[in-house]
Amino acid sequence: MLPRKVFFTKGVGRHTDPLVSFELALRDAGIEKFNLVTVSSIYPPYCEIVEAEKGLSELFPGQIVFCVMSRMTSNEQGKRIFASVGAAIPPDPSLNGYLTEYHGYCNGEDAGRHAEESAAYMLKTAFEIEPARTFNITVEADVEDCTTVVAAAVFVI
């Protein structure tokens, strides 16, 4: 199973119950209808990056869907949390790239940049090449009740 496409999405959910908070974050990201299976950090060769709407149009409710997901849940009122997925795409499409997850409490650091740089480092050290492109998808939120943030790279097989 080699994914043909990938899209990136993010969401925030708030509720008094952590599980419901997570569900609401998935809804906000548009991926609540799928049975999500998290995988590790490889961006597949020849994988096309598409807009979320296009990727979602090829998926069906209840489908098992693979993704790289960063997730953070907290009930520490007054804190700010983040979730980020960074990507490093190789110049040669026959090579794999890297996706990295990073999450935690905001501390002034550029979380998205950190995830992006981690992915770039993995690509550089795996193939001794510079990435053709790096980017990230990051979500931040102030904690109210129980808050969950999710960022995901979602694969379409």
From Swiss-Prot:
GO function term, MF aspect, one: arginine decarboxylase activity
Transmembrane segments: none
Annotated Pfam families: PvlArgDC
Cofactor: pyruvate
Cofactor note: Binds 1 pyruvoyl group covalently per subunit.
EC number, UniProt record: 4.1.1.19
Residues where Pyruvic acid (Ser) is found: 41
Keywords: Decarboxylase, Lyase, Pyruvate
Catalytic activity: L-arginine + H(+) = agmatine + CO2
Gene Ontology biological-process entries: arginine catabolic process
Enzyme class per UniProt: lyase
Residues marked Cleavage (non-hydrolytic) (site): 40-41
Entry-linked SUPFAM superfamilies: Pyruvoyl-dependent histidine and arginine decarboxylases
Entry's family note: Belongs to the PdaD family.
Protein name: Pyruvoyl-dependent arginine decarboxylase 1
Protein source organism: Archaeoglobus fulgidus (strain ATCC 49558 / DSM 4304 / JCM 9628 / NBRC 100126 / VC-16)
